[in-house]
From Swiss-Prot:
[CaMn4O5] cluster binds at residues 170, 189, 332-333, 342, 344. NCBIfam families: psbA (TIGR01151). GO terms for molecular function: chlorophyll binding; electron transporter, transferring electrons within the cyclic electron transport pathway of photosynthesis activity; iron ion binding; oxidoreductase activity, acting on diphenols and related substances as donors, oxygen as acceptor; oxygen evolving activity. Pfam families: Photo_RC (PF00124). The keyword Metal-binding applies. The modification Phosphothreonine is found at residue 2. It comes from Cryptomeria japonica (Japanese cedar). This is Photosystem II protein D1. Photosystem II (PSII) is a light-driven water:plastoquinone oxidoreductase that uses light energy to abstract electrons from H(2)O, generating O(2) and a proton gradient subsequently used for ATP formation. It consists of a core antenna complex that captures photons, and an electron transfer chain that converts photonic excitation into a charge separation. The D1/D2 (PsbA/PsbD) reaction center heterodimer binds P680, the primary electron donor of PSII as well as several subsequent electron acceptors. It is found in: Plastid, Chloroplast thylakoid membrane.
């Protein structure tokens, strides 16, 4: 009888825990995805802060030339970064217990791999948690779908690209200048500016910001005033009110006359779907572009594509970009390569005699 009572008590405790985890009444929803999200993001954040402040230099290229990234080793907020795991480690899973000592683990850039893998798990779980909360509340799932765009982008630069290139040392450093270095080297090696998927991403980001500004300004300019001119129009809105807060007909009429009639949405649902889909699809394409360039399916190459009747090259902007790419490529990892890959790949002409 005692055993039966204990089993009921433990089951009751588990049920209460499940109810608490999945309760939508909590100030912050936890959810089953949150059970994994919270420890992974806390770990990634904690290690990032500690490493950004105090991590010793890392041998990123695997040639015994450590690169300093932390504040205590001479960097500031702009130049500091978590240096990627050493090329000597490659794609190997490199937890602390795989190193002979903590000093070796730090020298080989172990914190980068720890942070990145925990971070990617955490943001994926955050996306799952968005879906989970939407499901509990009876909402549609599109919030999580929208968030999948930045998740895909982060996964592309922190995981897919290193896998394609064969080493975590090719991943994006976790810092401001490190991000810029990653972008410059990526352009030099993959000509990303000439990749159509990157172009779609640019259209998505800039177009999304334009449409967001247009929508916000149109709504703010067509509010239905419920107050006198002596007080703010915002005071006329009550949270949860049933009435429309702005006049979509007026906004539609204004914009339709400013551009042309069919450039303006007259359906609020279609409008907001478009506002969400435009940047999300653009960033999806950019993440897909990074993931294909990871395996060296690079941007368009129009180098020396225009020649005169004598066979002499007439430079186009593509050739100017190519010259810049070569310059950037010879300057990065200066002591790891004798020549940029584009030059080293060309077979030398044999000399007889």
């Amino acid at each position: 009888m005692t055993a039966i009572l204990e089993r009921r008590e433990s089951a009751s405790l588990w049920n209460r825990f499940c109810d608490w985890i999945t309760s939508t009444e909590n100030r912050l929803y936890i959810g089953w995805f949150g059970v994994l999200m919270i420890p992974t993001l806390l770990t990634a954040t904690s290690v990032f802060i500690i490493a950004f402040i105090a991590a010793p230099p890392v041998d990123i290229d695997g040639i015994r030339e450590p690169v300093s990234g932390s504040l205590l080793y001479g960097n500031n907020i702009i130049s500091g970064a978590i240096i990627p795991t050493s090329a000597a480690i490659g794609l190997h899973f490199y937890p602390i217990w795989e190193a002979a000592s903590v000093d070796e683990w730090l020298y080989n850039g172990g914190p980068y791999e720890l942070i990145v893998l925990h971070f990617l798990l955490g943001v994926a779980c955050y996306m799952g948690r968005e879906w989970e909360l939407s499901f509990r509340l009876g909402m549609r799932p599109w919030i999580a779908v929208a968030y999948s765009a930045p998740v895909a982008a982060a996964t592309a630069v922190f995981l897919i690209y290193p896998i394609g290139q064969g080493s975590f040392s090719d991943g994006m450093p976790l810092g401001i200048s490190g991000t810029f270095n990653f972008m410059i080297v990526f352009q030099a090696e993959h000509n990303i500016l000439m990749h159509p998927f990157h172009m779609l991403g640019v259209a998505g980001v800039f177009g999304g910001s334009l449409f967001s500004a247009m929508h916000g300004s149109l709504v703010t300019s067509s509010l239905i005033r419920e107050t006198t001119e002596n007080e703010s129009a915002n005071a006329g809105y009550k949270f949860g009110q049933e009435e429309e807060t702005y006049n979509i007909v007026a906004a539609h009429g204004y914009f339709g006359r400013l551009i042309f009639q069919y450039a303006s949405f007259n359906n609020s649902r279609s409008l907001h779907f478009f506002l969400a889909a435009w940047p999300v699809v653009g960033i999806w394409f950019t993440a897909l572009g990074i993931s294909t360039m990871a395996f060296n399916l690079n941007g368009f190459n129009f180098n020396q594509s225009v020649v005169d009747s004598q066979g002499r090259v007439i430079n186009t902007w593509a050739d100017i970009i190519n010259r810049a790419n070569l310059g950037m490529e010879v300057m990065h990892e200066r002591n790891a390569h004798n020549f940029p890959l584009d030059l080293a790949a060309v077979e030398a002409n044999s000399i007889d005699g």
